[in-house]
A protein has these predicted regions:
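Amphipathic alpha-helical interface surfaces
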Residues: 17, 21-25, 53, 76, ...
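Alpha-helix termini
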Residues: 29-37, 91
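Non-catalytic, surface beta->alpha helical segment in thiol-disulfide oxidoreductase systems
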Residues: 66-92
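Conserved short-loop catalytic and cofactor-binding motifs
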Residues: 13, 45, 68
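Structural micro-motif
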Residues: 54-64
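Local sequence-structure signature of Cys/Sec-based thiol-disulfide redox active-site neighborhoods
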Residues: 1-31
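Thiol-based oxidoreductase modules, predominantly thioredoxin-like and allied folds used
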Residues: 37-51
Length: 92
């Protein structure tokens, strides 16, 4: 079985847009799995725990990264779904 791609989710524990984006991501990934589509492994990273991550992503959270593709300031299900639909097939 091929390895599943890794999706990095950068956020903060005390960030309501991050919580909303996490919930949206979970819903989208469950939907993808139910349709037999590729679902990445998700690594949730809190930028507040690492000064380098805070400098790079602090003003942009929530941020989703797959491979070399980044989606900063994730704000909608449509935006997140389009990002996954565009990036995941390239890694399959």
């Amino acid at each position: 079985m091929p390895l599943r791609p890794v999706l990095l989710f950068y956020g903060r524990a005390s960030c309501s847009p991050c919580t909303e984006a996490r919930d949206s991501l979970q819903w989208i990934l469950e939907d993808r799995a139910s349709r037999g589509e590729l679902v990445p492994v998700v690594r949730d990273l809190d930028v507040a725990t690492d000064p380098d991550l805070e400098r790079r992503y602090g003003a942009l959270v929530p941020v989703v990264v797959i491979g070399d593709a980044e989606l900063p300031l994730v704000t909608s299900v449509r935006q997140l779904r389009a990002f996954l639909d565009a990036t995941l097939p390239l890694l399959a």
